[in-house]
Amino acid sequence: MSSTVGGGGSVETSGVRRTSKRPKYSKFTQQELPACKPILTLRWVILTFLVVGVVFVPLGVFCLRASHGVVEIVDRYDTDCIPEASRNNKVAYITGVGDKICNRTITVHKAMKHPVYVYYQLENFYQNHRRYVKSRNDAQLRSPSDERDVKTCAPEDNVDGEPIVPCGLVAWSLFNDTYRFSRNNQQLPVNKKDISWKSDREKKFGKNVFPKNFQTREPIGGGTLDPKKPLSEQEDLIVWMRTAALPTFRKLYGKIETDLHAGETIRVSLQNNYNTYSFNGEKKLVLSTTSWLGGRNDFLGIAYLTVGSICLFLAVTFSVLYLVKPRQLGDPTYLSWNRSAGG
C-alpha cells in the first residue's frame, strides 16, 4: 500500500483518504439526469413565427380599434387665457392679484357616453426630478405622530419653527386651476369623489392628519387645502402626490356623469391660476371616454401589429428559402473541413 509523508512528518494512506471523501453517487450530482434538448429546425422556426404573427396581428387590430373608439377633446388654454396686454409678461400676470377667470367653448364632435373623465394635462413639467421627488415625507402624510419629521422636505419644511403639513415641494406645487362646465345654460356637475386610488386614500394618507401652515408664506406654489378636512379626503392632493414619470402627463380632475351628445356646445368657466409660464410649460383641458383598454393610446396596438407583421414576414421568408434551397439537417457536407477550398 502506497503512502505519503507530509511536511509535519505525518503519514497518510492515499487510497483510504480518497475513498472516504468520495461523495455518494447520484445522477443529479453527476449531471446525468435524462434531458430534452430541442433542436431548432427550420420547420419549428417557421411554425413559431407563424403562430406569433397569427396571434399578434389580430390583437393589434383589436387594441387599435379600442383606442380609436375613445372620444377625446383636448383644449389648450394657457396662452388664450392671458389678456393681450399681458402676453409679453405672462409671469407677472399669473403671479398678480385678482381673479383670472377665463371662458372657453368646447364643441362635442362625437357622442360621449358617461362617465366622461375630466383631466388636466401639463407639459414640460418634470415631476420626476430627483430633488422634487424626494422633497416630501410619506410618514408625515400617514400619521400625526410624525408631524415634525420634515428633514427631507426642505425648503418647504417649516414656518417659524412650526412644521408644514403636508411638507415638501410636491405638495407645495399642487395644481390649482378649477373648471366649471355648463350646457344649454345648465350646469354640468363634476363628481370629484373617488378620483384617487383607493389604496392611496386608505394607506398613504391618514384620516387624522390635517393640513397645518400650508401655503401661509410667500412664495405660494399652488393650491391651498381645507384645514378642517383630513388628508385622506383631499383627493386633489392625493392625485397630485402620485408623481408622473414623464414631463407630459395627465391627472384626473373629476367625472361628468351624464352623456354628451354630438354637436353640443360645452361652456367652460375656468380659473387660470397655475403658473406654468415661468418654465415654458403648457396647460390643457382634456375630456375623454374610456375603453376596455383605458384611455386613448395607440402604442400597444401598433406594437402588436409591428411584431406580428415582422414574424409573418420572417415565416414567409424562411418558407421560401426552405422550398427553394432546402438543406438537410445534420448534413456533414456543410462542415468547413468537408468543403472544397474554392467553395
Residue ranges and their predicted role:
Residues 16-40, 82-94, 279-290:
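Membrane-proximal N-terminal segments immediately preceding the first transmembrane helix
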Residues 65-87:
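Alpha-helical transmembrane signal-anchor/signal-peptide segments
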Residues 16-54, 320-338:
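Helix-loop boundary elements of multi-pass alpha-helical membrane proteins
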Residues 99-238:
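Soluble non-transmembrane domains of integral membrane proteins
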Residues 293-343:
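Juxtamembrane interface at the cytosolic side of transmembrane helices
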Residues 118, 253-288:
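Extended, hydrophilic extramembrane loops/domains of integral membrane proteins
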Residues 88-100, 241-248:
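Extracellular beta-rich ligand/substrate-recognition surface
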Residues 53-68, 312-322:
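Membrane-embedded alpha-helices of multi-pass membrane proteins, especially ion channels
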